[in-house]
Amino acid sequence: MTNIRKTHPLLKIINSSFVDLPAPSSLSSWWNFGSLLGVCLAVQILTGLFLAMHYTSDTATAFNSVTHICRDVNYGWTLRYLHANGASMFFICLYLHVGRGLYYGSYTYSETWNIGILLLFAVMATAFMGYVLPWGQMSFWGATVITNLLSAIPYIGTDLVQWIWGGFSVDKATLTRFFAFHFLLPFIVAALVMVHLLFLHETGSNNPTGIPSDPDMIPFHPYYTIKDILGFLIMLTALSALVLFSPDLLGDPDNYIPANPLNTPPHIKPEWYFLFAYAILRSIPNKLGGVLALVLSILILAVVPILHTSKQRSMMFRPLSQFLFWLLVAVLFTLTWIGGQPVEYPYVIIGQVASILYFMILLILMPLVSIMENRLLKW
């Protein structure tokens, strides 16, 4: 008799995706982040659902409703801090996942890669709108500054900003619609994840060597299920430690001050995971130019497969490209640091140099070095 998991209409889909899926035998821990992102999304949707039961999206009561969640709701503080720090974990895993894709040449699966970029934008939009909901000082001013950037779009900019605000400033209408979209977007993200996996399973996984692994495949279960569970335990332990010992470590103290349109905070800055893009935005002294650079800092990932000039897929055996990759990582850390600093000397010039380097490495240096490596290997 055939096993039910192979015949049942629903179970056979799960079986072919998580049980009998042929996977390369050489996948390292860098391949764990996809499943970790799935866990992050599940944690965010669950905690978010329970938070939404107690939150009110009205400018008069939003801040107090968050205080009420933390003080009066059973384990409300746990839910709130799991949700806030869960977002940080989400982005740590996201950036490591994208970094893995860049290093090992996974971007040559262009459909999977492009859906991934779409997912990155969707998660960033969700996180931005979520940050506005507690209606603290940084929520209000962050929303004002970032939405105001759209006014740089020629001709329609001002109308577009007022349309998004639902008035002439960030107010009640803005908060209500941001809450609606913040609730909706994670489900769109979940749907996109399904498409992401669908395209991935069309081609099969890449592996650290970048060499086709068809002759050497192993079943996903039990090998990678156990490996993924270990990853879950490590990540959830780290998240729990963050939530229970220093829940406000990654937040901004200004957000514990209720939103006040008449009082601007000394340094308006987004959450840490947007600082690199914020630094790139600030490094260009022109509004439209800055907005374009901000969008391109993420959209540049779509160009990476086109600029792949190496005869090898992975960077595993390409030391010169490896050097550039780690230089890129250092540049991103530098940009993250600069994004949190005031706009003054020497931070401005460091940010500008780092921004130029960021685009130069991805657009010029990596393709050139790849060609050079081909020549060195007489290919």
Swiss-Prot record:
<feature type="transmembrane region" description="Helical">
    <location>
        <begin position="33"/>
        <end position="53"/>
    </location>
</feature>
<keyword id="KW-0472">Membrane</keyword>
<dbReference type="InterPro" id="IPR027387">
    <property type="entry name" value="Cytb/b6-like_sf"/>
</dbReference>
<feature type="binding site" description="axial binding residue">
    <location>
        <position position="97"/>
    </location>
    <ligand>
        <name>heme b b566</name>
    </ligand>
</feature>
<dbReference type="GO" id="GO:0008121">
    <property type="term" value="F:ubiquinol-cytochrome-c reductase activity"/>
</dbReference>
<dbReference type="GO" id="GO:0006122">
    <property type="term" value="P:mitochondrial electron transport, ubiquinol to cytochrome c"/>
</dbReference>
<keyword id="KW-0812">Transmembrane</keyword>
<comment type="subunit">
    <text>The cytochrome bc1 complex contains 11 subunits: 3 respiratory subunits (MT-CYB, CYC1 and UQCRFS1), 2 core proteins (UQCRC1 and UQCRC2) and 6 low-molecular weight proteins (UQCRH/QCR6, UQCRB/QCR7, UQCRQ/QCR8, UQCR10/QCR9, UQCR11/QCR10 and a cleavage product of UQCRFS1). This cytochrome bc1 complex then forms a dimer.</text>
</comment>
<dbReference type="Pfam" id="PF00032">
    <property type="entry name" value="Cytochrom_B_C"/>
</dbReference>
<feature type="transmembrane region" description="Helical">
    <location>
        <begin position="178"/>
        <end position="198"/>
    </location>
</feature>
<dbReference type="Pfam" id="PF00033">
    <property type="entry name" value="Cytochrome_B"/>
</dbReference>
<dbReference type="InterPro" id="IPR030689">
    <property type="entry name" value="Cytochrome_b"/>
</dbReference>
<comment type="similarity">
    <text>Belongs to the cytochrome b family.</text>
</comment>
<dbReference type="InterPro" id="IPR048259">
    <property type="entry name" value="Cytochrome_b_N_euk/bac"/>
</dbReference>
<feature type="transmembrane region" description="Helical">
    <location>
        <begin position="320"/>
        <end position="340"/>
    </location>
</feature>
<feature type="binding site" description="axial binding residue">
    <location>
        <position position="83"/>
    </location>
    <ligand>
        <name>heme b b562</name>
    </ligand>
</feature>
<protein>
    <recommendedName>
        <fullName>Cytochrome b</fullName>
    </recommendedName>
</protein>
<dbReference type="GO" id="GO:0005743">
    <property type="term" value="C:mitochondrial inner membrane"/>
</dbReference>
<dbReference type="GO" id="GO:0045275">
    <property type="term" value="C:respiratory chain complex III"/>
</dbReference>
<keyword id="KW-0249">Electron transport</keyword>
<keyword id="KW-0813">Transport</keyword>
<feature type="transmembrane region" description="Helical">
    <location>
        <begin position="347"/>
        <end position="367"/>
    </location>
</feature>
<feature type="transmembrane region" description="Helical">
    <location>
        <begin position="77"/>
        <end position="98"/>
    </location>
</feature>
<feature type="transmembrane region" description="Helical">
    <location>
        <begin position="113"/>
        <end position="133"/>
    </location>
</feature>
<dbReference type="InterPro" id="IPR005798">
    <property type="entry name" value="Cyt_b/b6_C"/>
</dbReference>
<feature type="binding site" description="axial binding residue">
    <location>
        <position position="196"/>
    </location>
    <ligand>
        <name>heme b b566</name>
    </ligand>
</feature>
<keyword id="KW-0496">Mitochondrion</keyword>
<keyword id="KW-0479">Metal-binding</keyword>
<keyword id="KW-0999">Mitochondrion inner membrane</keyword>
<feature type="transmembrane region" description="Helical">
    <location>
        <begin position="226"/>
        <end position="246"/>
    </location>
</feature>
<dbReference type="InterPro" id="IPR036150">
    <property type="entry name" value="Cyt_b/b6_C_sf"/>
</dbReference>
<keyword id="KW-0349">Heme</keyword>
<dbReference type="InterPro" id="IPR005797">
    <property type="entry name" value="Cyt_b/b6_N"/>
</dbReference>
<dbReference type="InterPro" id="IPR016174">
    <property type="entry name" value="Di-haem_cyt_TM"/>
</dbReference>
<comment type="function">
    <text>Component of the ubiquinol-cytochrome c reductase complex (complex III or cytochrome b-c1 complex) that is part of the mitochondrial respiratory chain. The b-c1 complex mediates electron transfer from ubiquinol to cytochrome c. Contributes to the generation of a proton gradient across the mitochondrial membrane that is then used for ATP synthesis.</text>
</comment>
<keyword id="KW-0830">Ubiquinone</keyword>
<keyword id="KW-0408">Iron</keyword>
<feature type="transmembrane region" description="Helical">
    <location>
        <begin position="288"/>
        <end position="308"/>
    </location>
</feature>
<keyword id="KW-0679">Respiratory chain</keyword>
<dbReference type="InterPro" id="IPR048260">
    <property type="entry name" value="Cytochrome_b_C_euk/bac"/>
</dbReference>
<keyword id="KW-1133">Transmembrane helix</keyword>
<dbReference type="GO" id="GO:0046872">
    <property type="term" value="F:metal ion binding"/>
</dbReference>
